[in-house]
């Protein structure tokens, strides 16, 4: 461990074989490009003391590989899985515009009050992810790499940067992007 405040790296998974809305209910693997871009994101030489990841294969497989290569412990936390898109899992926005345009529009305009059909609400998602985040509780100077999803990282960034939950979908989190959080802090 280093001296100073705890440091968290939030790494979004890379490109997957999935199409459309790929949330908690879509356990799709990375493409070769997805693997390469994640490795490239970590090529800057950061050293991690432990790795925590979502249970979904697009996060878990690279986390296992990176932890083994670095010789650091790995923890899988179900609470770091992506939002559950319910009936929209695996469906593209274009397909939904043909069959469920009104519901999709309501979700995009007001995701807090309009969840995907049979999916998870943003308030439920927030509660789950915040509980997982707070349990990270890194020690002083500890460096923790969290490999997760766009929704999870958007939520942590929204809390950290003061964005309202209603604007969550507008926060840019590209595939295989690394976001540094220093110092770590718990959220409510």
For the regions a protein language model found, what residue spans apply to each?
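Active-site-proximal alpha-helix that buttresses catalytic centers in soluble enzyme cores
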Residues: 6-72, 99
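Short, low-complexity, intrinsically disordered N-terminal peptides in bacterial proteins
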Residues: 1-7, 134, 183-188
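Generic beta-sheet signal
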Residues: 8, 140-151
């Amino acid at each position: 461990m280093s001296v100073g405040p705890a440091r968290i790296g939030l790494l979004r998974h890379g490109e997957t074989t999935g199409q459309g809305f790929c949330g908690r209910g879509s356990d799709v693997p990375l493409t070769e490009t997805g693997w390469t871009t994640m490795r490239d994101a970590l090529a800057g030489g950061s050293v991690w003391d432990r790795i925590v990841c979502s249970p979904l294969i697009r996060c878990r497989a690279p986390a296992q590989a990176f932890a083994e290569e670095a010789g650091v412990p790995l923890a899988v936390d179900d609470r770091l899985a992506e939002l559950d898109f319910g009936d929209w899992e695996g469906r593209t926005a274009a397909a939904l515009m043909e069959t469920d345009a009104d519901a999709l529009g309501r979700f995009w305009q007001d995701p807090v009050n309009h969840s995907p059909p049979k999916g998870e609400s943003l308030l439920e998602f927030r509660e789950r992810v915040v509980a997982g985040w707070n349990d990270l509780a890194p020690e002083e100077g500890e460096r923790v790499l969290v490999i997760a999803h766009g929704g999870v990282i958007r939520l942590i960034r929204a809390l950290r940067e003061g964005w309202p939950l209603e604007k969550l979908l507008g926060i840019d989190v590209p595939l295989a992007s690394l976001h540094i959080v220093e110092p770590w802090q718990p959220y409510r």
